[in-house]
Amino acid sequence: MYIPGPLRLSSYLLPFLSSPSPPAQSSPDTRTISFKPVHAHGHAFVDNASTPTLLFLDQSPSASLYAHDYPIGAFGDDYVLPRLTSDVLEIRTRKKLIRRPKVRPPRIISWAQSYRAQALHFNGINNNNDNSNKSISLPESWLAPDLANPSDEWSDVEVTVPDLTDRQTVITLAKMSSNAYVTPGGAGWYTLNDWNASMPFGWEPDADGLRGHVFADEKNETVIISIKGTSAGVLGSGGPTAKNDKFNDNLLFSCCCARVDFSWTPVCDCYAGGYKCGQTCLEDALVSESVYATVGTNLYNNITYMYPNATIWLTGHSLGGAVSSLIGLSFGAPAVTYESPGELLPASRLHLPLPPGMPANLSGITHVYHTADPIAMGVCNGPYSSCYAAGFAMESKCHTGETILYDTVRVKGWSVDVRTHRIEEVIDKVLADPWPEEGEGKSGVWEKAVEGWYRAADRVRAALDESVVRDDVNVWWGWGRRGPKRQPGGEDPGWRKHGGVPKPVSEEDCVDCYKWEFGEWN
């Protein structure tokens, strides 16, 4: 007869010996894992090379991560945060179906190249003329699968993904996204405790391109790539990547090469006068090696080579979130973004798998943002916007996959302000508080926000609904709760570590650049 040892037996008994209000039991498909940073990643032009080189940095023994349960703004930029004995940060996982091509594309741009090759091949076959240069051979290595026949060329694979119904998981991934901005040991790090330290890429002084960190669990079964967002003047920061960040923001999220008006210098030559823009020209511009989405291929392929048996996740904030999403769509990897600009526009120009062939709930992409962020909501444009003043053409608003939307304008009474785009603001003032689960809170408040999120974008500065009293909202929605206090007996029983996350929805009926006409004018 098998008799379990003391350690194993204790694991059975601990749940019954703990506090009288234990956390909800996980389902068989749900488990909690911990990570630590193992690498840093980045890319830069080395030795006069024509293409950027991917750089890695293994974790330093002196690398330290910091956590906080108070606003980071309480400290100066150069202040070294103290080591805190905060609760261990956890990520809860679950199983989810993700639709993937049976044959993985070699690169992100393979989708666009395959589409172009097949279109030219089709036109060459059906046009009986001697202009043979219009027809090229179909690529032998990889052909984009047909989304019209998902059963033949696609597989719905059960994958381990972060459980985004769990608030602690949403916060932990947001902190990983925040850590992508700063080098190990810097003042902006959060303590990740049992999480493996990441491998930051591109942190050398001359590394002016894509940056971030790589996290892994103890068994290297799950690896998380975090990618840095924009470091530029519109967000109150800068650094060596600011120039590339601005170029890629304007190329990815503008309607036509950042040609906002006559005073702007376009980032590509696709403008055809009026509100006309060259579609093929735009697609060609996006496959340039200088674009972060393209360089992300090298990063993803290198990580899969280093961890061949691991499940790869991606996360990032702002531009880093959009790049994470584009990589995830290309390779069928789960991605969680924070305050990302609408990346449906560049995804469609790269011919990545999108609805209706790729249902939003099978894409594995989830965007987390709030309604007071003009960048994520797609309203940071026009001559009086801060984005315009800083030279950013942030004109897209539609997101791929599913969206977890926090209606901070209606519920918290926030004004639309580009400063709320910062990841620290999101962690401290949005994610730190539990939002009502289905059936809780003021009736109709959340439903109104979700149903009309894209129509409300143009009037997002509207005052708080008269039917909602601010004090009542604070009581119902738990604003100001920051979790267990450090003093004995100071715990807040109303603060919940798990749950309290809005339900993901797809952004149906969203349209970008409705004034523009795209065709072949160049």
Swiss-Prot record:
Residues 481-506 are annotated as: Disordered. The active site is at 318 (charge relay system). The keyword Endoplasmic reticulum applies. It is an enzyme of class 3 (hydrolase). Residues 27-522 are lumenal. It catalyses: a triacylglycerol + H2O = a diacylglycerol + a fatty acid + H(+). Residues 1-5 are cytoplasmic. It is a single-pass type II membrane protein. SUPFAM superfamilies: alpha/beta-Hydrolases. Lipase which is essential for lysis of subvacuolar cytoplasm to vacuole targeted bodies and intravacuolar autophagic bodies. Involved in the lysis of intravacuolar multivesicular body (MVB) vesicles. The intravacuolar membrane disintegration by ATG15 is critical to life span extension. Binds to both phosphatidylinositol (PI) and phosphatidylinositol 3,5-bisphosphate (PIP2). This is Putative lipase ATG15.
